Amino acid sequence: EDIVLKAMPLFDEVIVAVGINNMKKCAFSLEQRLQWIKDTFADYPKVTVAHYEGLTVDFCKENGVKFIVRGLRGNADLEYETMIAEANKKINPEIETVFFLTEPSLRCVSSTVVRDLIKHNCSVEQFVPENVCLKSENLKT
């Protein structure tokens, strides 16, 4: 939510595109994640939600997207995201990557942290948008 809100003033439209990565174990179904994102940004007409398989740069080309927005929590994210941005640029030179720093209070948040907290029945409300209700019984096993 933080990064999308930061990007909104710079772009006419912001597409929150969820990439399907079969190598990654997701705690919640794609449908559930897409719905949470749609609900989170329901009051923002500039924000649309999509999903895709394959390369992000291919999604961008197919949808006329010129900028990829990424959030950075720290140095590790910067190194990783820089490598990805450079690879994307080699694949499609028309694509630029824009980085935003995550709010300090959210820098500790990752899907792994949230998933572990849920598994241990800890509250995650300070880490996720208020419309997202995460409970251990909803986790995919």
Segments predicted by a language model, with ranges:
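Nucleotidyltransferase catalytic core that binds NTPs
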Residues: 1-141
